[in-house]
């Protein structure tokens, strides 16, 4: 998902300036090094201290917030759909330098370089970005344990389960003819098919659909095609008669994950009413 790659050269060029800003008054002129044995220096927040979390995108940010983090800084703005267009600012590296945790996804290999450029001792945490409910709750559990916010994570999961069940039930009542619709979904939007209780008859992506795949998927006669809004290549199965539904994976700037499910449910319900 190329949406979240940033320019590493820009980051490295900024690192010297940023480090000067954040460390210039570090030794108080006494020539002694600071103690690096504190919890903060090892990447873990001090006892009773709320963790400072830096994330690459709003998706990781929403997971962190769900897990109980309150101090969350997003590096790549939500408005950047093609991250090479984003020029990192000194404030980005300054934020990483002060972080306890830096969250990234496995398809974002630049995260370690961001941390290195900032000279941060933060703990680098890989997050499995998938809105499948079971995977979301597993990540929230993991992060809550790391942050020391397990109780907050448990509370969020309870609310999430209730909202998910409500949306799933509402979508099932909208099934055309009372029957689970057949769908073809992009690999990163399969969670939305699950939310609708739909029957997945095929998947595609993240690479472009080949002529052979096009023929094979069209032959399955899906009622719906779920398209990843962040990686859309236009109409996936032209002339198939399937209704194409755009699914958004990334949360907004409020880092609230629940609207992602509500918005997907609204789009799915609308599509099922016309299929």
Stretches found by the model and what they are:
Residues 1-23:
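Sec-dependent bacterial lipoprotein signal peptides
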Residues 68-89, 188-215, 246-257:
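Alpha-helical, coiled-coil/dimerization segments enriched in small aliphatic residues
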Residues 116-183, 255-275:
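Extracytoplasmic substrate-binding proteins
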Residues 53-55, 60-64, 152-205, 209-216:
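Basic- and aromatic-lined ligand-binding clefts that recognize polyanionic substrates
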Residues 51-52, 135-136, 220-275:
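Structured C-terminal subdomain patch of bacterial secreted/periplasmic proteins
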Residues 71-150, 234-242:
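Acidic/His-rich segments in extracytoplasmic proteins that coordinate ligands and/or metal ions
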Residues 46-67, 75-87, 230, 252:
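Extracytoplasmic "Venus flytrap"
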Residues 22-38:
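Bacterial lipoprotein signal-peptidase II cleavage site
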